[in-house]
Regions:
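C-terminus-biased signal that marks the final domain/tail of proteins
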Residues: 1-114, 220-227, 233-238, 245-247, ...
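Short N-terminal edge-element motif at the start of the domain
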Residues: 209-221, 230-231
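N-terminal accessory/precursor segments of enzymes
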Residues: 10-54, 145-215
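Short, structured patches in soluble enzyme cores that scaffold and shape functional sites
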Residues: 121, 181-185, 208, 226, ...
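Internal mixed beta-strand/loop scaffold within catalytic domains of large alpha/beta enzymes
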Residues: 90-191, 343, 355-358
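Short, surface-exposed charged micro-motifs
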Residues: 169, 251, 345-347
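Active-site loop ensemble at the mouth of alpha/beta enzyme cores that anchors a bound cofactor
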Residues: 251-274
Length: 381
């Protein structure tokens, strides 16, 4: 078992980005993460829960996602507990807080100068002005790049924080499959009661990200996997941008009422743009007019900015320009109680299976790290 943690960069000694390398069985990796959660982050798992629901959820994950179930066993052992005790929920950590505001574009290899595929991605979140306060509810004070080499599934690199689900928000695996989440503000507007606010049987909104990284090598495999699993929303509906090394891509969304799965296919010869506005509702004039009438910036605004910027590009495109286009939708606004910021900009290279991550890019581009995931010698889980 190998479990190493190293600080990459920090902002004002209050917002930290660290790198973890974890190698071993899924259970041992889970144990290492669990020890970090309890010792460094004081994540409390004593919340009152419905033990019958937890038992049903554990049974589902044991049968449908055994890799995560093994990590959960490690989580539980770090807390001195067992998965046979259904009075605790070790399917995820932390709290279910408000959603992120995000923008991402996938550029397939056919339209880039070096024939590499790229995802350029902004992760935006509100920073409370009292974020330096120990009691401030800002979940991204400690964020991790988790480079993971489990014995029984694909190696991967993912971004996560314990205080917000403790599950991957995005990542890339050794086969070049990349998965990015974006909060789905539109479905939330229509159905504010969609969230369960507690664990249910199936996959919550973030668990599919690591699931696909663990088990899938292509976009086609990822789509088939998503069609087969049960979904529910603890806090916020999300949609997923998924792309592979071969240039295939799609966006996984929900229907307007949140009940059906929708798959929007990308094109191997053109960029695939996605923000917090659902692609399957771009033709919904009622919805677009409602978003246009809002006085605050929203996902539809950012989608149109990206569209305008990309329309001006003469392809093939360079990696530098790919990164620069996303600067046009960086968020940097000050409000009375909080600061709206692009917390991270990430550039995923689906050809080299690597990622560049920059902390607070609107403030300091030098706070950046580069990570590359190794393939196993036989190229299989």
């Amino acid at each position: 078992m190998k479990f190493e943690k190293k600080l990459i960069t920090t902002f004002q000694n209050e917002i930290h980005l660290s790198h973890i390398i974890a190698e071993g069985t899924n259970e041992s990796i889970g144990s290492g993460l669990g020890a970090l959660a309890i010792n460094d982050h004081d994540i409390d798992k004593s919340t009152k829960i419905n033990s019958a629901i937890i038992e049903s959820q554990y049974d589902y994950l044991r049968n449908h996602y055994p890799e995560h179930y093994a990590r959960m066993s490690g989580f539980a052992k770090a807390y001195g507990k067992s998965l046979n005790d259904y009075n605790y929920d070790f399917s995820f950590f932390g709290q279910a807080l408000n959603g992120t505001a995000c923008s991402a574009v996938y550029y397939p290899p056919a339209i880039t100068c070096n024939k590499h595929g790229y995802i350029s991605r902004n992760l935006d979140f509100s920073i409370p002005k009292d974020f330096k306060n120990k009691n401030s509810r800002f979940p991204f004070k400690h964020t991790y790049i988790l480079e993971m080499y489990p014995e029984s599934c694909f190696p991967s690199i993912s971004l996560f924080c314990f205080e917000l689900f403790g599950l991957a928000f995005e990542g890339i695996n050794s086969e070049g499959l990349s998965v990015i989440h974006l909060a789905d503000a539109d479905t939330r507007i229509d159905h504010e009661t969609l969230s369960t606010n507690q664990t249910q049987r199936g996959f919550n909104e973030f668990l599919p990200i690591q699931y696909l990284l663990d088990t899938c090598s292509t976009a086609d495999e990822a789509e088939k996997a998503l069609r087969q699993v049960e979904h529910y929303h603890v806090a916020i509906p999300v949609h997923l941008l998924i792309a592979d090394k071969q240039g295939n891509s799609f966006v996984f969304e929900y229907s307007p009422d949140g009940s059906k799965k929708v798959f929007v296919q990308g094109n191997i010869a053109s960029p695939l743009k996605v923000t917090n506005f659902q692609l399957n509702r771009l033709s919904d004039t009622t919805m677009t007019k409602m978003m246009e009438s809002r006085s605050i910036e929203n996902g539809l605004d950012r989608y149109r900015v990206l569209e305008d910027q990309i329309d001006q590009v003469r392809f093939p495109i360079t990696e530098k320009l790919i990164q620069e286009i996303n600067t046009n939708v960086y968020v940097h606004a000050d409000h009375e109680d909080e600061l709206e910021r692009t917390l991270f900009h990430s550039t995923y290279d689906t050809t080299s299976c690597s990622v560049k991550v920059c902390l607070l890019p609107t403030i300091n581009r030098s706070m950046e790290g580069f990570f590359k995931v190794r393939r196993k010698s036989n190229g299989s889980p």
